[in-house]
Amino acid sequence: MVAVSLKCSVQKNPLIIGHRGAKGHIAENTLPSISKAMALGVDGIEIDVFVCKTGELVVYHDKSLDRLTGGVGLIEELTLEEIQKLTVLGKYKIPTLVEVLDLIEAKVFLNIELKGSKTAKPTDELLKKYLQQGDWRPEHIIISSFKWEELQQFRKLNTAVPIAVLINNDPLEAMPMAQSLDAIAINPNFKSLNETNTKIIQEAGFKVFPYTINETEDIKKMMQLSVDAIITDYPDRVDQVLSN
């Protein structure tokens, strides 16, 4: 069982986080993709959630349906029954967050990205149910989002579950928000990182969990920067670099 350490000490090797499961191997954000990532030995899984029309949290990356399902419209405007009739890449079902939590069973930690609007409250409500029973603990979860207002709402509702602040440009711009949220980490685009800003973030007490690193040379560069985790579509590639 892998938990997210709240301590900011530098670990020997970065954690491996499967991006949308094992997106490079099996269709993203599906149960088979998550199972594949776990079989590849990840420390954590990253997924995306929206709230559908009937209120359930569904695991899906895009606001619109066309790229992955061939459907039309927005996922937030469909009922769960309608969503369950769709398939990702003609083969895989779109899972609910409940199904993902039940599949993982806290064997690895889960990074839930709040992708859609008004996701903080239902995510908090669902997690509190799981945290009151079974093996799940706050340290087995990370909540992240580019929608910082959702992170603020989540923190008002839940002070126990760790938060990571997502940012696509200068990662130092996320530090004030991370401080106000008592966040555990900043999750930047890996291309925005260098030795200086990585050190500044870590010395301020935050972990650095960059996304999405798939090429061997980029994995090596991130290791040279001593990042705390690597979010990747190919967990096996990171493992291979670590092994060498």
Predicted regions and their residues:
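Phosphate-group recognition and catalysis centered on beta-loop-alpha active-site segments
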Residues: 2-244
